[in-house]
């Protein structure tokens, strides 16, 4: 056991324009090869496209999309007596948001389209409406957890 004290949980910083932590989470997840300015450009263009498509506040659409994709429960592989079981576990809000952001970006990368800003804006609008690949991924995870409910006591 470590003799050091517990580390404080890092608080996510806000982005410079929208002053929002979710936007910063998106930027940090979309980041490739340390090109943060390009990541900011992509996110801001996507938010501008959302504004044009829906004529709503893009931050509220983003919040709604992330709320819709955030899972309550997930499955974790656990080895018990030579066989591996998918054990359902409850997820905290921070971990759920991180998963939601990851799924949204993965779904938008798979989408056909011109550029990442366009694909991300389309995926966010779809997720806010309750459709799209990210929503399907959440439902699939919930189905897996429900199917393996018998192994919940292995936690």
From Swiss-Prot:
A GO cellular component entry from the record: small ribosomal subunit
Lineage top rank: taxon: Eukaryota
Family annotation (PROSITE patterns): RIBOSOMAL_S7
Pfam families, per database record: Ribosomal_S7
Subcellular location, record wording: Plastid, Chloroplast
InterPro entries for the chain: Ribosomal_uS7, Ribosomal_uS7_bac/org-type, Ribosomal_uS7_CS, Ribosomal_uS7_dom, Ribosomal_uS7_dom_sf
Keywords: Chloroplast, Plastid, Ribonucleoprotein, Ribosomal protein, RNA-binding, rRNA-binding
GO MF annotation, one: rRNA binding
GO terms for biological process, alphabetical: translation
Main location: plastid
Coiled-coil regions listed: none
Gene3D superfamilies: Ribosomal protein S7 domain
CDD domains hit by this protein: uS7_Chloroplast (cd14871)
Family under the similarity heading: Belongs to the universal ribosomal protein uS7 family.
Function, in words: One of the primary rRNA binding proteins, it binds directly to 16S rRNA where it nucleates assembly of the head domain of the 30S subunit.
HAMAP family with a match to the protein in the record: Ribosomal_uS7_B
Protein's name according to its UniProt entry: Small ribosomal subunit protein uS7cz/uS7cy
